[in-house]
């Protein structure tokens, strides 16, 4: 019997980044949806977007599910899952983290990135009209999509939107998350150059007991090589 997946995107992205993965999963008899977070549609008013707006969006999607689903988060969505999952544990059959930020209690994403990166993004957001971090093309090409074809880089960059900085600066609490008994898996694209080697799997130690599935690809392999990511997700499924 097929599973139903709910995919949560990370910073700058929208639900569209999961389209290729969803198509691959549907070929295998699964169903899926990928909501776009507040402020992440083109033309959205991003001023005033708060961290809780993201969490509330996820919990509202979960509330509409008729039966438990597989909840998947990529990149910055990792810590959104840490905050949202405890609010709707009965709606979640399994949690899967894909090259995701897993934060310690009381920390924000900016606490786990190089200080110069956090400082540069903060300055850029302060200079913007809506407190957003603009799309940083060099970062996308040389870290998020290192080694990917230029045409794929261009395609992704054309769809990214400015990121409300609250996602990066808000500390989370993990007390409720660490008490969950939901099975957890990590699907890790092992060619990811967006952080130093070992950083993502190091953060994943905060998940406790989890299953690790490694696949090939960059941080953006969900967009550039969705078949490989879908295969990893299927391998990770708990029946």
Q: How does the language model describe each region?
A:
Residues 3-44, 69:
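Conserved HGGG/HGGXW glycine-rich cap/lid loop of the alpha/beta-hydrolase fold
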Residues 31, 37-70, 86, 110-114:
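Active-site loop/oxyanion-hole signature of alpha/beta-hydrolase fold enzymes
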Residues 180, 186-188:
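Short beta-strand/loop motif that positions the catalytic acidic residue
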Residues 72-77, 81:
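Gly/Ala-rich beta-loop-alpha elbow adjacent to hydrolase catalytic centers
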Residues 158-177:
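Active-site nucleophile elbow and catalytic-triad environment of alpha/beta-hydrolase enzymes
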């Amino acid at each position: 019997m097929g599973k139903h997946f709910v995919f949560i995107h990370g910073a700058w992205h929208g639900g569209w980044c999961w389209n290729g993965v969803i198509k691959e999963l549907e070929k295998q008899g699964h169903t899926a949806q990928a909501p776009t977070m507040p402020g992440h549609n083109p033309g959205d008013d991003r001023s005033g977007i708060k961290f809780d707006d993201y969490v509330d969006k996820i919990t509202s999607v979960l509330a509409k599910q008729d039966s438990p689903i597989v909840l998947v988060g990529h990149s910055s969505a990792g810590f959104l899952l840490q905050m949202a999952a405890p609010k709707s544990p009965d709606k979640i059959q399994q949690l899967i983290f894909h090259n995701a930020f897993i934060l310690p209690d009381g920390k924000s994403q900016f606490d786990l990135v190089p200080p110069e990166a956090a400082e540069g993004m903060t300055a850029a957001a302060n200079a913007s009209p809506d407190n957003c971090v603009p799309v940083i093309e060099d970062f996308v090409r040389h870290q998020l999509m290192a080694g990917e074809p230029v045409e794929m880089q261009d395609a992704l960059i054309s769809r990214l939107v400015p990121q409300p900085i609250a996602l990066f600066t808000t500390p989370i609490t993990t007390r409720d998350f660490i008490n969950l008994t939901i099975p957890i898996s990590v699907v890790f694209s092992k060619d990811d150059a967006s952080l130093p080697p070992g950083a993502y799997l190091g953060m994943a130690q905060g998940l406790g007991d989890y299953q690790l599935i490694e696949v090939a690809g960059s941080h953006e392999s969900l967009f550039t090589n969705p078949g490989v990511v879908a295969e990893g997700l299927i391998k990770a499924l708990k029946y």
